[in-house]
Structure formats: C-alpha cells, structure tokens
Swiss-Prot record:
The protein's name: Ovomucoid
Transmembrane stretches, start-end: none
Location of the protein in the cell: Secreted
Glycosylation sites: 42
Residues the UniProt record annotates as site (Reactive bond 3): 15-16
Principal localisation: secreted
Disulfide bond sites: 5-35, 13-32, 21-51
Domain Kazal-like: 3-51
Domain notes: Avian ovomucoid consists of three homologous, tandem Kazal family inhibitory domains.
Database matches in SUPFAM superfamilies: Kazal-type serine protease inhibitors (SSF100895)
Pfam families linked: Kazal_1 (PF00050)
Recorded GO MF terms: serine-type endopeptidase inhibitor activity
Organism classification: Eukaryota, Metazoa, Chordata, Craniata, Vertebrata
Stretches of the chain forming a coiled coil according to its record: none
Length: 51
C-alpha cells in the first residue's frame, strides 16, 4: 500500500482526521501530515488507521 505524496511538503494541513500509521510507528492525523513527514524523514506507510 502506498500514498501518493507528490506535491509535498505543504506549509499547512487541514484538521480532518483520517489516520495513517507510519513505518516509524507514529500515527499521523491525515495524508497531509503523513506526507510532510514522509518527505522530511523518509517514512513509509505502515497501514491505514491508528498505529
């Protein structure tokens, strides 16, 4: 499972809650928050939902 993070990082993310669990075992609140981290820290998607 992958998430398309082209166009990231973004300076601001919305507050919508659609959790994704990163390979760093951290829960990200939505795709924007996840993709910002993915671009900066080379995190990949563990699974959809909370860790």
């Amino acid at each position: 499972v992958t998430v398309d993070c082209s166009g990231y990082p973004k300076p601001a993310c919305t507050a919508e809650y659609f959790p994704l669990c990163g390979s760093d075992n951290q829960t990200y609140s939505n795709k924007c928050a996840f993709c910002n981290a993915a671009v900066e820290k080379n995190v990949t998607l563990g699974h959809f939902g909370e860790c």
